Swiss-Prot record:
Residues 73-83 have a biased composition (Basic and acidic residues). GO terms for cellular component: mitochondrial inner membrane. GO terms for biological process: mitochondrial gene expression; mRNA stabilization. This is ATPase synthesis protein 25, mitochondrial. Residues 1-42 form a transit peptide. It comes from Trichophyton verrucosum (strain HKI 0517). Probable mitochondrial mRNA stabilization factor. It comes from the Eukaryota. It is found in: Mitochondrion inner membrane. The keyword Membrane applies. The keyword Transmembrane helix does not apply. InterPro entries: Atp25, NT_sf.
Length: 703
C-alpha cells in the first residue's frame, strides 16, 4: 500500500494532497482523536452515522431558537453567570457526572445513509461489511464529484470500517474478496492482505528467529514488519445508478483513465489504532468541503477576528529559532530581485543613529531583515536591530495602529508611502516580522500572518526566502530562553501550516529538511522537562523541587508526532541537514524518544558522515544528565571502544574524558571508592585510564 501511495509524490497536485494529509494527521494543530460517527461536514458529501438524526434535531430546534433569541438573550446571560458562579463553589467530589451521555454499543453497527444515485451493489456491500464481516463505525465518502479525481480513480466511493484486531482484519478482507468473486464475478484487489494462515506462519517464523537470535524484544515491537493494520480492497468498476449525475456533461478531462459512467468502490479496512492515526475521514472531508476547516473557532479567531490597535493581549515575542538563523548559517546566499546598496542610505539629522552611539560595541542582531524590502526600510530595520530590546520595543509604539508616536514609526511610514504596492506589502511584512522577533506585546503572530495573507491576496510574487522567513517566525518560541514547559501554541503552528500550504500551491517545494526540522522543534518543549512519574530518570544531583515536570502522556504525545514526521520524511525521501543533527539528538533524548535518538545516531555513518567528538561529547553528557544507570552502562560499554574505530578516530581530550567520567559515576556511583580499595569492577580499568589521561592533560597544559 505504501509503495502505491508514494508514486503520487511525482505529481504536484498529489504533493499538495499529501501535505494536507500531513496537516490533518500530524496532530500539530489539534490533538489526534479517533473520528466519531456523529461528525458531519455541512454541505459536503461525507456520509456518516447519526447524521440523519443529528441534522434533524438541530434543524428542528433552529426555528424556535431564532424566534426567542432577542427576548431571551439577557435572561440567558444572567442565568449562565449565576450558574457558573454557583458551580465554582462545588468541589470536584460532589460534582454530578450523570449528565455525561455514553454512546450505545449498537451505534457502532449502524449503516451510513446511501448517497444520491447509489450503485445497485452498494447497499448489499454495506450490509455484508457490517453484518457478515463485522466491521464497526462504517463511514461512506462520495468522491464522485471530486475534481481533479483521486489517485484511486474517477467516480470513486470510499467505505471506511474498523476491525477489532489484526486477525479479524485479515479474515474480513479475505472473506470480502471471496464474496465479491462468487456473488458478483468481480476481481477485487486487496493491498496489505495476508492470505489464510499467512499471518500465523509469519508470526511463527518471527518467534522462531527471535528465539534463535535471543532477541526477545522484537516480539513486543508495535511495528512487527508483517502487517500495517490497514487493508485497501479495491472492488473495481461497478454499474452506476439509473440516474445520471449532475456533473455528467462533457468537459475536458485531465488525469489518468477515462470519464466512464461506471463507479469504482474502495473499502478501507483498518484496526482502531491505525484509523485514529491516519484520520482518513478528516483528509477526504477537507477535500470535499474546504469550508469545513473554517468551522474550527480556536485558531481562526486569532486570524480573522478583530485585529485593532487596542488589542494587546495575546502575543509575546520569540526566541532562538528565527532570530539566530542568520547566525547559524552566516555564509548562506540568496538570489535577490533588486540590488541592495553597500552602505545604508543616510538619514536626516533626526534619525536613529543619534540614539545608537558610535562608541558603544555592536550588539548581536535579533532581527533578520528581509533582503526583499526596500533600501530605506532595510536600513531602518538594521538601525532598529542595533538598539537594546527594551529601547527597540519603545520605538515600535503602541501597536499596529500606531503610526506617528515614535521617530522610527514616522520614518518607516514615510518611506512606505513613497513605494509601489508590492514594495509596500513586502515592507509591512518585514516590519511585522521584526516586531514579533522583538517580543513586543502589542504585535502578535496573527498580525504577521495577516500581512502575509494580504500580500498573497494581492497577487504579488512571494519568494521562497520571504515565505520561509515567515514560517520560521511563526514556528518560533515566545517565552524567554530555557523557559519551563514552553511550547509553540497550536494557533501559531496552524498559521505556519497555512503558509506552507500556500507555498505548496505556488509550486515551492515544502518537503525539505529545514521545514521538518522546524516542525520537530515546534512540536516539542523548548527546554528539557523530565516526566512526572519517571523514577530515576533525573540525575540525583539536581534538586527535584526546582525542576518543572510534565505528565508522561505529554511526552508520549510529542513522541507520536515526531514518529509521524519521521515516517513522512522517509516516504518523501527527505533528510535533515547535518548541522541540525546535534540539536535533533538532544531533543529526542530529552523527550524520552530513545528509539529515534539511536536510529538517527546509527544513520549518521550510513550517510558517509563521520561521528565527531562533539557528537560523542553530547551523547555522554546526555546520559550523565539523565541519571539512568542501565542506559549509562550500555552507552559506556558500546561506544567508548567505538571511538577508536571511527573514521577518523575520535581522540580523547580533557573535555571528553570528564564527560566519560561523569557518565561512569552514573553507571557505578562508587567507582572512585572501588578504585582506591583495589576492587575490580566493570569500569575500574577505564576509570584509571581516565585519571591518567587527566594527569597528562594537566601536565601538558602547565608546560
Amino acid at each position: 500500500m505504501s509503495g502505491i501511495a508514494l508514486q503520487g509524490f511525482r505529481c504536484h497536485a498529489c504533493r499538495n494532497a499529501a501535505f494536507r494529509s500531513f496537516a490533518a494527521i500530524s496532530s500539530l494543530s489539534s490533538s489526534t482523536r479517533r473520528p466519531q460517527s456523529s461528525i458531519s461536514y455541512p454541505g459536503s458529501k461525507l456520509y456518516q452515522r447519526n447524521v440523519r438524526t443529528t441534522g434533524r434535531r438541530q434543524f428542528s430546534a433552529l426555528g424556535s431558537v431564532q424566534s426567542q433569541a432577542d427576548s431571551d438573550l439577557p435572561t440567558k446571560t444572567e442565568t449562565k453567570e449565576d450558574t457558573s458562579a454557583e458551580s465554582s463553589h462545588i468541589p470536584w467530589y460532589l460534582q454530578d457526572e450523570s449528565h455525561k451521555p455514553s454512546s450505545h454499543p449498537l451505534k457502532q453497527q449502524e449503516l451510513p445513509p446511501l448517497p444520491e444515485n447509489p450503485p445497485p451493489i452498494l447497499e448489499n456491500l454495506l450490509q455484508y461489511i457490517s453484518v457478515d464481516a463485522g466491521l464497526d463505525d462504517l463511514a461512506l465518502l462520495d468522491l464522485r464529484g471530486l475534481d481533479p479525481p483521486p489517485a484511486l480513480g474517477a467516480n470513486l466511493i470510499m467505505i471506511i470500517g474498523t476491525a477489532r484486531s489484526v486477525k479479524h482484519l485479515n479474515v474480513s478482507g479475505d472473506r470480502l474478496c471471496r464474496w465479491l468473486r462468487s456473488n458478483y464475478q468481480l476481481r477485487p484487489v486487496a493491498d496489505g492482505l495476508l492470505g489464510r494462515n499467512d499471518l500465523k506462519i509469519k508470526l511463527r517464523r518471527r518467534a522462531r528467529k527471535a528465539k534463535v537470535t535471543g532477541d526477545a524484544s522484537s516480539l513486543n515491537s508495535r511495528d512487527d514488519g508483517i502487517t500495517t493494520g490497514w487493508i485497501c480492497v479495491n472492488v473495481g468498476d461497478v454499474e452506476n445508478g439509473p440516474l445520471k449525475t449532475k456533473n455528467s456533461r462533457n468537459r475536458n478531462f485531465i488525469g489518468f483513465g477515462g470519464t466512464e459512467d461506471k463507479v469504482r468502490i474502495v473499502v478501507q479496512m483498518l484496526v482502531e489504532e491505525t484509523r485514529s492515526e491516519l484520520q482518513l475521514e478528516a483528509l477526504w472531508g477537507s477535500l470535499l468541503n474546504p469550508e469545513a476547516g473554517e468551522m474550527n473557532p480556536a485558531p481562526r479567531d486569532d486570524v480573522w477576528g478583530d485585529l485593532s490597535s487596542e488589542t494587546t493581549s495575546s502575543g509575546k515575542g520569540v526566541d532562538s529559532i528565527a532570530s539566530t538563523f542568520s547566525q547559524r548559517f552566516p555564509g548562506r546566499r540568496h538570489i535577490h530581485t533588486q540590488a541592495r546598496p553597500n552602505t545604508p542610505e543616510p538619514l536626516s539629522h533626526e534619525t536613529l543613529g543619534d540614539i545608537v552611539q558610535e562608541s558603544r560595541p555592536a550588539l548581536p542582531s535579533k532581527i533578520v531583515s528581509t533582503s526583499m524590502a526596500s533600501p530605506n526600510v532595510s536600513s531602518l530595520l538594521e538601525q532598529l536591530s542595533r538598539l537594546p530590546e527594551e529601547e527597540a520595543r519603545r520605538e515600535l509604539g503602541l501597536g499596529p495602529g500606531d503610526r506617528d508616536s515614535t521617530l522610527f514609526l514616522r520614518l518607516f511610514y514615510e518611506a512606505v508611502s513613497k513605494s509601489d504596492t508590492e514594495t509596500v506589502l513586502i515592507d509591512k511584512l518585514s516590519f511585522a516580522r521584526a516586531a514579533v522577533l522583538l517580543k513586543h506585546p502589542a504585535y502578535r503572530k496573527a498580525d504577521l500572518y495577516r500581512a502575509f495573507k494580504s500580500m498573497a491576496a494581492s497577487g504579488c510574487s512571494i519568494s521562497e526566502e520571504l515565505a520561509m522567513d515567515t514560517v520560521r517566525t511563526l514556528l518560533s518560541f515566545q517565552g524567554p530562553e530555557n523557559a519551563a514547559n514552553e511550547r509553540v501554541p497550536e494557533q501559531d503552528i496552524d498559521l505556519a501550516l497555512r503558509v506552507l500550504e500556500h507555498m505548496s500551491l505556488r509550486g515551492i517545494n515544502i518537503f525539505n529538511g529545514e521545514v521538518f526540522f522546524l516542525l520537530h522543534k515546534a512540536s516539542a518543549f523548548q527546554s528539557h522537562v523530565p516526566a512526572n512519574d519517571a523514577p530515576g530518570a533525573m540525575n540525583t544531583s539536581v534538586n527535584p523541587d526546582s525542576v518543572s515536570k510534565v505528565q508522561v502522556e505529554e511526552l508520549d504525545r510529542i513522541t507520536t508526532v515526531h514518529n509521524r514526521l519521521s515516517k513522512l520524511m522517509a516516504s518523501a525521501n527527505v533528510d535533515f541537514d547535518y548541522k541540525d543533527y546535534p540539536e535533533l539528538l538532544k531533543m529526542y533524548f530529552e523527550h524520552g524518544n530513545y528509539s529515534n535518538f539511536w536510529r538517527l545516531w546509527h544513520r549518521i555513518p550510513l550517510m558517509q558522515i563521520p561521528r565527531t567528538k562533539e557528537l560523542y561529547l553530547l551523547m555522554f553528557r546526555l546520559h550523565a544528565k539523565l541519571g539512568h544507570q542501565r542506559q549509562a552502562v550500555d552507552c559506556l560499554s558500546s561506544w567508548v571502544p567505538m571511538m577508536a574505530r571511527e573514521q577518523p578516530p575520535v581522540a580523547l581530550d580533557e573535555e571528553l574524558t570528564r564527560a566519560i567520567m561523569a557518565c561512569m559515576l552514573v553507571a557505578d556511583p562508587a567507582i572512585d571508592q572501588k578504585t582506591d580499595d583495589g576492587t575490580v569492577s566493570q569500569f575500574t580499568r577505564l576509570w584509571k585510564q581516565c585519571l591518567r589521561d587527566l594527569e597528562s592533560f594537566k601536565a601538558a597544559n602547565s608546560q
